[in-house]
Amino acid sequence: MSQSGKNGLTYSDAGVDIDAGNLMVEKIKPHVRSTRRPGADGEIGGFGGLFDLKAAGFTDPVLVAANDGVGTKLKIAIDANKHDTVGIDLVAMCVNDLVVQGAEPLFFLDYFATGKLDPDQGAAIVAGIAAGCREAGCALIGGETAEMPGMYSGGDYDLAGFAVGAAERGQLLPAGGIAEGDVILGLASSGVHSNGYSLVRKIVSLSGLAWDAPAPFGEGTLADLLMTPTRIYVKPLLKAIRATGAIKALAHITGGGFPENIPRVLPKHLAAEIDLDAIKPPAVFSWLAKTGGVAANEMLRTFNCGVGMIAVVPAEEADRVAAVLAGEGETVFRLGRMVARQDGAPGTIYKGSLAL
């Protein structure tokens, strides 16, 4: 029989503070409301989040779902006590995976797990999630905050995100008809994004630099620059898809780099020929390669190396698609082309060299 009365145990004695959780909910409500969009009212507190597809303007939609995390980039956030941008990363990693299938992100849910809940820290994280949702045009309709003493040490926490989008039936990507000679457009990344951070942290450890030290590759501290949020490509890509009808395939360059991600959207008889001379890697990648002695091939299969997204388009439409994307604020360049692929050959081949 459990103890009761004034000397009995409480949930708080076990390390779970329900009042702290309630305080965090009150702090995040304005951020959640800021993500309101057609189909979602921007309120939280129910047992489940609601979304009205008809109110969002869809007639015969196919739903597309994705989930992801931020990986060990979170360790930098924790060590540097900088929590206001990892939520943007969380949203970006999910919604960029939706748009590559031609889907408009509609709603997002998050999972935040920690050993000891700090309401201000949690609110900062959710503020970043809300900022990412606004940028992607999706509503934050719910989430879970789990305080789990004994599961996480110190100030450690983890995040997971879940996004659902939709496309009208028949408008999903990749589309058919990818052909030899099609052009591959590259869209510049904002930096390292959210992949390869275990290697990043290893290199920083070897360098002996503290997180608050001036970054050797740009203006700001090492933590600030390495915490640059993942770019969200949703609205520019949706504009280009709808305005041109010319995009045949998109690939989000995440873990595994070019060789693991581009072939996922290609037919087996075609390969992507990437012109490495066309890439202008941000200075952070040169610093990582030189400081860690990381070979170019390893860089290409670990990091985005300056290209966060690629689009496959007909050669005659490349300039028009690039112009639409540039008009929406993207840095776009011709990255390569589609070539015939021999049996057993890799789906990504390179020419030129990466300027690291």
Curated annotation (Swiss-Prot):
Origin, by domain of life?
Bacteria
Annotated pathway: Purine metabolism; IMP biosynthesis via de novo pathway; 5-amino-1-(5-phospho-D-ribosyl)imidazole from N(2)-formyl-N(1)-(5-phospho-D-ribosyl)glycinamide: step 2/2
Q: What is its main location?
A: cytoplasm
UniProt signal peptide: none
Where it sits in the cell: the answer is: Cytoplasm
Give the E.C. number(s): 6.3.3.1
Q: Which UniProt keywords apply?
A: ATP-binding, Cytoplasm, Ligase, Nucleotide-binding, Purine biosynthesis
Q: List the disulfide bonds.
A: none
* A GO MF term: phosphoribosylformylglycinamidine cyclo-ligase activity
Q: Name one GO cellular component term.
A: cytosol
Q: One biological process GO term for this chain?
A: 'de novo' IMP biosynthetic process
Its catalytic activity?
A: 2-formamido-N(1)-(5-O-phospho-beta-D-ribosyl)acetamidine + ATP = 5-amino-1-(5-phospho-beta-D-ribosyl)imidazole + ADP + phosphate + H(+)
The text of the family note is: Belongs to the AIR synthase family.
| Protein name per its UniProtKB record | Phosphoribosylformylglycinamidine cyclo-ligase
Give the taxonomic lineage as stored in the record.
Answer: Bacteria, Pseudomonadati, Pseudomonadota, Alphaproteobacteria, Hyphomicrobiales
* The encoding gene: purM
